[in-house]
């Protein structure tokens, strides 16, 4: 079974280096924005998706678009809605601006992932692509579509959801919403504030992928 990884905003493939599960391809956030991943998936008969952060948002989109093809879904710090509103715990525009600045700073040696020897999950991209990604995150709201999807029968495949309890980018309450959308999902809340969970719990993500019924087919 082919496993496709949908990466997060401003992130390089190195963020997945500690995960050992075999993957067919890691799609960058730019490839998500450009429709490359959608085109590839449309030509596959079946697949497993692993989506992190912005890639998790796209994984939710593709779950609704290709429900019969999708044979397993792993959501890592994923959210249907990144921004805060009256009834939703999310980021403020000011926090998003700080995230952009922090991402640029994190690319240097001071980033804790580099100092500790773990993969650095962030890589600098062009200003144009960074802005495109942020525009997507600011505008996207999949909550109503997901609620309608769940009401119509939802997914039949296994779903795993991993979320840090104190993540400052994707709030823990987001996982509760996703758990309601996918009532049979395995939801695991992780202690701490790490957003790039693939460098903290790679073995749990590996186990989730390998637990998919058709993983070895």
Regions found by a protein language model. Give the residues of each.
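Conserved HGGG/HGGXW glycine-rich cap/lid loop of the alpha/beta-hydrolase fold
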Residues: 1-35
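Short alpha-helix in the alpha/beta-hydrolase fold that links the catalytic acid
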Residues: 18, 171-180
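Gly/Ala-rich beta-loop-alpha elbow adjacent to hydrolase catalytic centers
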Residues: 51-55, 59
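Flexible "cap/lid" loop of the alpha/beta hydrolase fold
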Residues: 64-65, 70-101
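Conserved alpha/beta-hydrolase catalytic His-Asp/Glu region
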Residues: 101-153
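Short beta-strand/loop motif that positions the catalytic acidic residue
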Residues: 155, 161-163, 167
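Acidic catalytic loop of the alpha/beta-hydrolase fold
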Residues: 166-170, 195
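Catalytic histidine-centered segment of alpha/beta-hydrolase-like enzymes
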Residues: 193-206
């Amino acid at each position: 079974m082919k496993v496709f990884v949908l990466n997060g905003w401003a992130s390089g493939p190195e963020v997945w280096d500690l995960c050992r599960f075999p993957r067919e391809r890691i799609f960058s956030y730019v490839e998500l924005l450009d429709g490359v991943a959608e085109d590839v998936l449309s030509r596959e008969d079946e697949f497993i998706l692993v989506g992190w952060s912005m890639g998790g948002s796209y994984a939710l989109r593709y779950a609704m678009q290709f429900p019969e093809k999708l044979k397993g879904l792993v959501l890592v710090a994923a959210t249907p809605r990144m921004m805060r509103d009256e009834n939703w715990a999310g980021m403020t525009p000011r926090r998003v601006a700080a995230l952009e600045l922090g991402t640029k700073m994190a690319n240097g040696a001071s980033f804790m992932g580099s100092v500790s020897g773990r993969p650095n999950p962030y890589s600098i991209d062009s200003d144009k692509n960074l802005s495109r990604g942020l525009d997507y995150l600011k505008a996207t709201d999949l909550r109503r579509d997901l609620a309608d999807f769940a009401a119509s029968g939802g997914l039949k495949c296994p779903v795993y959801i991993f979320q840090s309890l104190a993540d400052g980018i994707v709030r823990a309450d987001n996982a509760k919403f996703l758990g309601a959308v996918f009532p049979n999902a395995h939801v695991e809340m992780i202690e701490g504030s790490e957003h790039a969970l693939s460098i903290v719990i790679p073995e749990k993500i590996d186990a989730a992928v390998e637990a998919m019924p058709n993983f070895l087919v």
